């Protein structure tokens, strides 16, 4: 199953968080919001192509929307003195409506070489610039493994090098276990627009396995109220103390009943 489906979609809710996080009131609103989210992502990826955007997360309420943009080069998105933010806000308002409050956060990707979206985009750009395919793929594999990845798989398909018959070319380095759900697999698909047709680029990156507490931390960030943990520990300590007192009372009572009567 892991070989057939989108590796990101298979892990949503397990070790990946959803990229659109909201709850709609009606089915009609659900459909409208899905279309709006797709329009927002298409606009950002197209306008800021050179910023190498990794992913765009969207959080909504009925009256507001917050967009998180993760990019390798956030300075290109922000512009001089954050002038581009106003342009982005106006564009998103046109999509979702003027009555919706819009917030935009631009975040820098810590290690771009471990983002499948960025690696696939760089490889597609190299193909568009007429870089030899084998050289571009080997450079991408070497860069990702050097960044600390456990494994990488790259699949390029189409009229490679302009040949008449389309074919596939795949490189695999390291361990890429697509069926193991605890494995943090990042997947992305990009396209290289050539004069003789479109070449598809697929990238899978194994960023290691997630165990124990980290396995659940990847799902969502849970914010606890102040003092909740201390109160929880205090309640547990009181419960254990009451339990020990009851046990001691029961033991003393049974011990007294078992003592032989004095003559």
Swiss-Prot record:
Residues 40-108 form the KH type-2 domain. Residues 249-263 have a biased composition (Low complexity). Keywords: Ribonucleoprotein, Ribosomal protein, RNA-binding, rRNA-binding. GO terms for biological process: translation. One of its GO terms (cellular component) is cytosolic small ribosomal subunit. InterPro entries: KH_dom, KH_dom-like_a/b, KH_dom_type_2, KH_sf_prok-type, Ribosomal_S3_C_sf, Ribosomal_uS3_bac-typ, Ribosomal_uS3_C, Ribosomal_uS3_CS. Coiled coil: none annotated. Residues 224-263 are annotated as: Disordered. Pfam families: KH_2, Ribosomal_S3_C. It comes from the Bacteria. Residues 239-248 have a biased composition (Basic and acidic residues). GO terms for molecular function: mRNA binding; rRNA binding; structural constituent of ribosome. Binds the lower part of the 30S subunit head. Binds mRNA in the 70S ribosome, positioning it for translation. Part of the 30S ribosomal subunit. Forms a tight complex with proteins S10 and S14. Belongs to the universal ribosomal protein uS3 family. This is Small ribosomal subunit protein uS3. The lineage of its organism: Bacteria, Bacillati, Mycoplasmatota, Mycoplasmoidales, Mycoplasmoidaceae. The gene is rpsC.
């Amino acid at each position: 199953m892991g070989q057939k489906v989108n590796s990101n979609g298979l892990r949503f809710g397990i070790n990946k968080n959803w990229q659109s996080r909201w709850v709609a009131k009606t089915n009609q609103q659900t459909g409208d919001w899905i279309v709006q989210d797709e329009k927002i992502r298409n606009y950002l990826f197209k306008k800021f192509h050179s910023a190498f955007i990794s992913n765009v997360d969207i959080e909504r309420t009925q009256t507001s929307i917050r967009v998180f943009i993760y990019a390798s080069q956030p300075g290109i998105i922000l512009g001089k003195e954050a002038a581009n933010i106003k342009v982005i806000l106006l564009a998103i308002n046109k999509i979702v409506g003027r009555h919706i409050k819009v917030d935009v956060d631009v975040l820098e990707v810590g290690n771009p070489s471990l983002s499948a979206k960025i690696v696939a985009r760089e490889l597609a750009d190299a193909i568009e610039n007429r870089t030899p395919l084998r050289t571009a793929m080997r450079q991408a594999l070497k860069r990702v493994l050097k960044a600390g990845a456990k494994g990488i798989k790259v699949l390029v398909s189409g009229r490679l090098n302009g040949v008449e018959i389309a074919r596939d070319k795949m490189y695999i380095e390291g361990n890429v276990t697509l069926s193991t759900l605890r494995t943090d697999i990042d997947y992305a698909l990009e396209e290289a627009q050539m004069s003789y047709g479109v070449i598809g680029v697929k990238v899978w990156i194994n960023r290691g396995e997630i165990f124990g507490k980290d396995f659940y931390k990847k799902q969502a960030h849970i914010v606890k109220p102040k003092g909740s943990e201390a109160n929880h520990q205090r309640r547990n300590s009181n419960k254990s103390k009451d339990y020990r007192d009851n046990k001691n009372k029961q033991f003393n009572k049974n011990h007294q009943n078992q003592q032989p009567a004095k003559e």
